[in-house]
């Protein structure tokens, strides 16, 4: 009980500091926030040796825990990935400041003038798993949008996240912004997660970024509002009017470019009229690339079971199924999908339009790799996750999605009749 009490006190203190920092960030200048992010980017690159050394400790921890190759890939940092973190910080720094943006304005016959203006949410709690770059992405986006943030990274990335967090704090310090604007939970103890989820006095929204287990835990236990990021059970429907070369290129990229990200394809749905030719070619190409294909009605593959539909592999495995038409594909996706990202490959615009109209995934694609399901690829610089719910934020959650709004009403001694 003593440990739990200590964690409770620690989390309460983080919450108090975050709330105080949020009050200052709400009116921080765009220039100061940009300077903090540029300073953080410079610090990340200057300290890349320290970050890689910290990451080596996490990789050893991951090996000892028996993490899967996909999880180890998510965890690993090298100079190229650190350069990606630096680039992401600089991109967010150079974006327009969303705070204070006038979303709409109008005059009323009564004589009042009304503006709807973007405002920060306040304090955001971000809970994520093994990918340490989320520390930088989440910290940057929350700062850009004028929010304080409490980061709770996965136990696997504890040391990497700490090293990156130190760089973010260095940027805040250099820019004269409150260092408590970006805080990292200083323990691996899971009790800290439970505390964070119930801190209604200090936290305005929780953003979970991870697998089904994490998101389910957050949705069950949270008393704070949640932006849900469900797993990416990503489908690609190959229509009978698909261009074979486009289909092959898109499918191979969507599955094999990086298997451990939420935009990786996990299930192919192939029109029955092309199953014996293009379908067989796709299966053959995937197998030759080292992908295990679990299929129904396609030669050369392993037999699929019911458990393969609706499964996020995050690995060199893909499910495949022959379907009658686009409506059968839509029905399958509705039953087994996660409303994350789904794609149609076709040259028939009517089929593409039907796919877009009849599905309600956060991201729908036509003749493009599902690996574009990423805030950076959407021009957001970085993302805090892909929101699959229908309230407030949906799709890639960038800085603008981490704001609310308020109404500014101006008169001239105006009174209501």
UniProtKB/Swiss-Prot annotation:
Superkingdom of origin organism: Bacteria
Cellular compartments annotated: Cytoplasm
Gene Ontology molecular functions: glutamate-5-semialdehyde dehydrogenase activity; NADP binding
Family annotation (InterPro entries): Ald_DH/histidinol_DH, Ald_DH_C, Ald_DH_N, Aldehyde_DH_dom, G-glutamylP_reductase_CS, Glu-5-SA_DH, GPR_dom
BP terms from Gene Ontology: L-proline biosynthetic process
Enzyme type, top EC level: oxidoreductase
Gene3D superfamilies noted in UniProt: Aldehyde Dehydrogenase, Chain A, domain 1 (3.40.605.10), Aldehyde Dehydrogenase, Chain A, domain 2 (3.40.309.10)
Pathway involvement of the protein, from the record: Amino-acid biosynthesis; L-proline biosynthesis; L-glutamate 5-semialdehyde from L-glutamate: step 2/2
Role played: Catalyzes the NADPH-dependent reduction of L-glutamate 5-phosphate into L-glutamate 5-semialdehyde and phosphate. The product spontaneously undergoes cyclization to form 1-pyrroline-5-carboxylate.
Family annotation (HAMAP family): ProA
Similarity comment: family membership: Belongs to the gamma-glutamyl phosphate reductase family.
UniProt name for this protein: Gamma-glutamyl phosphate reductase
Organism listed in the record: Ruegeria pomeroyi (strain ATCC 700808 / DSM 15171 / DSS-3)
